[in-house]
Amino acid sequence: MRSAASRLHKGFSFAKRFQGCSDWICCDGAAWAGRWDAWAPGGTVRGKAFSHVVLDLGCGKGEYTVACAKLRPDVLFVGFDVDAVCTLRAAEAASAVGVDNAVFLMDGVPSFGDEVEAGISDSGAVSCGDSGNPSESKTLELADCPCSTATGARGDSPDASLTPVKCPEQAHASRASVRKGARSGAPAEIDLSTVFAVGELSALLMNFPTPFPKKKKAHLRLTYLDRLMGYRPLLGRGAGIRLRTDSQPLRDFSLTQLELAGYEITWRSDDVRVEFPDEPWSAYERKLTEQGACVFGIAACPGPAPEHVEQTAPLSLVSYLPDNLDRLDYVPHGMQGCVENLRNRNARERARGMQEFRPPVI
């Protein structure tokens, strides 16, 4: 899959673009841990604290994040995406409309060459943190929307004493992303446990995250067991996570992970748009729905912490595909090649009078 950087025009200057929207970018999230409710553009401190802090994990170009911020001026929306160019464009979107309750994380200043590093360093444009009425839309009311049921505050997490479970291979629990050699200059990873204090988040949103269908990349999914365990201490009392995706296999996989991580499902839907028609759109969601995608959704809150954490679910998303692939009206994003290969194989088996191939559960 091409990165955002690979699609940039020849004259694109990250440094110049960064300087124009740096007030909405935070390059040292750890400096704000425990006091995000006081953040203001440019890394200044606001007078009145935000009522909630919401993390949009995998925010892309920020259309959804900024739209939510416009609807809920009393809530701070913190966005993070693995691609620094997407983060830049999200900050530009926030700057363009002038919202003061949206900020986008970069784990340090990304490297795009000497021109970029020099431009950012000389400008000093790094938000590192020195010392209207809410919409009546059903979509974003934190009290009754599946986005969140949060009522807690910092330090009020039911799992405040938990140590995030680390993945044996990469120790990435609570890491937002892991990517090697990102051409876009994106950070290799970000450790959410250093960016947010215990119980600081009122909600954690995951909108159309990358599904990583292959078994060997399952640990990169935002709803992987180790990551879900890492989110628990960061969620305040009554807070939860919400997933929206076009992928039924990812939704079903996520249900297994939530159960293993001790979360309680508070809401699920096979068509989120029917239940929440006024919810903000992102360009990515519009693209998928125009292709025939239905939006699946889950909301969950941490329940009692499991005594023993063990991965027992099938990890390949192929294991969550329906038996009859010919009845699949929409193929989830990222699985088109796999489904086409399986359909072709089944067609050949039928032509030979043989039983159709069914991939093993792995």
What are these regions (language model features)?
Residues 58:
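Conserved S-adenosyl-L-methionine
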Residues 94-120, 179-198:
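S-adenosyl-L-methionine
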Residues 1-50, 266-362:
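SAM/dcSAM-binding transferase cores
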Residues 223-237:
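A short glycine-rich, Lys/Arg-flanked "PGG" loop and its adjoining helix->strand segment in the class I
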Residues 62-66:
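Glycine-rich SAM-binding Motif I of class I
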Residues 237-245:
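Conserved beta-strand signature within the Rossmann-like core of class I S-adenosyl-L-methionine
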Residues 83:
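Conserved SAM/SAH-binding beta-strand->alpha-helix loop
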Residues 90:
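Conserved SAM-binding loop
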